[in-house]
């Protein structure tokens, strides 16, 4: 997912390199395979390394069918069409939210990135943040700091998002085609 934004494509080489190194050692890799306790024990392994990964955290909107995650966009399950509006609510301040926003903005969607932080991509350092922000500006994205997403509802075939300012308590509504939330990742704990 990290390599979906064009300037971060070289990141995909890390996974390829790691895969090659492990295979050189003769490790039997089982990727993209549903593992259960029974299926693992049936193999009678000498050693087991479980890298369960995680799932996107939807935060307080976990039960809502009105919000998507940055994973939905970056994995290609959802792709707003050119001209459609997207609000990306980035509560993590890391690469995922701004990468998602940049990805859809550079493909012609109208994008707003809202965050409770004092600026977009708050947790990124001085090397990566300026690149994301520059690319978002070039694509015409709007960046709105100091707000929390406090509500989401359907209005016809669009979605109404309520953003609440952390300092004043003032609320504003946005009516968009897609809402994407980035709240980080939850560990997959079903195997242990």
Model-derived segments and their meaning:
Residues 2-8:
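Short glycine-enriched, charge-decorated loop/helix-capping segments at active-site entrances
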Residues 12-57, 66, 71-75, 82, ...:
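A Rossmann-like FAD-binding core segment of flavoenzymes
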Residues 82-111:
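Rossmann-like NAD(P)H-binding beta-loop-alpha module
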Residues 1, 60-63, 100-102, 191-192:
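Short amphipathic alpha-helical segments
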Residues 76-77, 95:
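Hydrophobic transmembrane alpha-helical segments of multi-pass transport and channel proteins
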Residues 4, 93, 184-185:
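Short beta->alpha junction loops/turns
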């Amino acid at each position: 997912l990290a390599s979906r934004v064009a300037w971060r494509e070289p990141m995909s080489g890390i996974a390829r390199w790691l895969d090659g190194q492990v295979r050189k050692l003769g490790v039997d890799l089982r990727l993209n395979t549903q593992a259960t306790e029974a299926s693992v024990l049936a193999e009678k392994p000498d050693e087991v390394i479980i890298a369960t990964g995680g799932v996107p955290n939807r935060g307080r909107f976990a039960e809502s069918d009105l919000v998507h995650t940055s994973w939905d966009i970056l994995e290609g399950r959802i792709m707003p069409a050119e001209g459609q509006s997207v609000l990306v609510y980035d509560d993590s301040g890391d690469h995922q939210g701004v990468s998602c926003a940049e990805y859809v903005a550079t493909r012609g969607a109208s994008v707003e990135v809202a965050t409770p932080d004092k600026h977009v991509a708050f947790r990124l350092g001085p090397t990566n943040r300026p690149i994301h922000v520059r690319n978002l500006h070039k694509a015409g994205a709007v960046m709105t700091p100091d707000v929390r997403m406090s509500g989401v509802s359907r209005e016809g075939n669009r979605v109404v998002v309520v953003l609440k300012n952390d300092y004043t308590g003032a609320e504003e509504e946005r009516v968009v085609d897609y809402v994407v939330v980035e709240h980080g990742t939850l560990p997959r704990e079903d195997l242990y």
